[in-house]
UniProtKB/Swiss-Prot annotation:
Homotetramer. Forms an RuvA(8)-RuvB(12)-Holliday junction (HJ) complex. HJ DNA is sandwiched between 2 RuvA tetramers; dsDNA enters through RuvA and exits via RuvB. An RuvB hexamer assembles on each DNA strand where it exits the tetramer. Each RuvB hexamer is contacted by two RuvA subunits (via domain III) on 2 adjacent RuvB subunits; this complex drives branch migration. In the full resolvosome a probable DNA-RuvA(4)-RuvB(12)-RuvC(2) complex forms which resolves the HJ. It comes from Rickettsia prowazekii (strain Madrid E). One of its GO terms (cellular component) is cytoplasm. Keywords: Cytoplasm, DNA damage, DNA recombination, DNA repair, DNA-binding. InterPro entries: DNA_helicase_Holl-junc_RuvA_I, Hlx-hairpin-Hlx_DNA-bd_motif, NA-bd_OB-fold, RuvA, RuvA_2-like, RuvA_C, RuvA_C_sf. GO terms for molecular function: ATP binding; four-way junction DNA binding; four-way junction helicase activity. This is Holliday junction branch migration complex subunit RuvA. Residues 64-141 are annotated as: Domain II. HAMAP family: DNA_HJ_migration_RuvA (MF_00031). SMART domains: HhH1. The keyword DNA damage applies. The RuvA-RuvB-RuvC complex processes Holliday junction (HJ) DNA during genetic recombination and DNA repair, while the RuvA-RuvB complex plays an important role in the rescue of blocked DNA replication forks via replication fork reversal (RFR). RuvA specifically binds to HJ cruciform DNA, conferring on it an open structure. The RuvB hexamer acts as an ATP-dependent pump, pulling dsDNA into and through the RuvAB complex. HJ branch migration allows RuvC to scan DNA until it finds its consensus sequence, where it cleaves and resolves the cruciform DNA. Gene3D superfamilies: 5' to 3' exonuclease, C-terminal subdomain, DNA helicase RuvA subunit, C-terminal domain, Nucleic acid-binding proteins. Has three domains with a flexible linker between the domains II and III and assumes an 'L' shape. Domain III is highly mobile and contacts RuvB.
């Protein structure tokens, strides 16, 4: 499975790019917003989601882990596949999606080609609880390299290790405020170290 590609954009098409990695060209599909940022001849790091089927292997590329995570999150909704997930991400950023669901704004989804009233309703119903948890973490990650979904997973891990939800959120927020560029592994280690030192 391919998780990341570092290379030069060799060619640019309507819904994909060819990225040259050490002489090997990989065809990578991406959202319109991501494609608009990729310039032929320049080097980029793309986070990759690999879909393996009997008849094909498709690679989907993202400039941020947050967009990749939302690509997978959207596909958890009944009726949304890879093409529709990319279409939504071509029109809306992850933050746009969070805000729309938090504000119960179906119209922003219905304005996207292929998303009718029924699918917009399913997006609201099936992602509401997930997005609410993610949205509560968004303030924590304002100046951080870590995505909101990853922050939520860190807090769940800390709760499983004995933190209350309140303790986990306050601890994570305090650590990221002091070190916005901290990695997920170091974030968890620091949180546990801080908790142990307080006893």
């Amino acid at each position: 499975m391919i998780g990341k590609l570092n290379g030069k954009i060799d060619s640019h098409c309507d819904d994909y790019v060819i990225i040259d990695v050490n002489g090997v060209g990989y065809l990578v599909y991406a959202s319109g917003k991501t494609l608009a940022k990729l310039v032929e001849g320049k080097f980029y790091k793309l986070f990759i989601e690999t879909h393996v089927r009997e008849e094909h292997i498709h690679l989907y590329g993202f400039l941020t882990l947050e967009e990749k995570n939302f690509f997978n999150l959207l596909q958890s909704v009944n009726g949304i596949g890879t093409k529709m997930a990319l279409s939504i991400l071509s029109n809306l950023t992850p933050t746009d999606i969070q805000i729309a669901i938090n504000n119960d704004d179906r119209n922003i989804f219905k304005a996207i080609s292929g998303v009718g009233a029924k699918l917009a309703e399913r997006i609201m119903l099936e992602l509401k609880d997930k997005i609410t948890k993610i949205f509560s973490s968004s303030a924590i990650i304002k100046d951080s390299n870590i995505s909101s979904i990853a922050i939520n997973e860190v807090m769940k891990a800390l709760v499983n290790l004995g933190f209350t939800r309140f303790e986990a959120q306050n601890t994570v927020q305090g650590i990221i405020t002091q070190n916005p560029k901290i990695s997920i592994d170091e974030l968890i280690k620091t949180a546990l170290k801080n908790r142990n030192s307080s006893f």
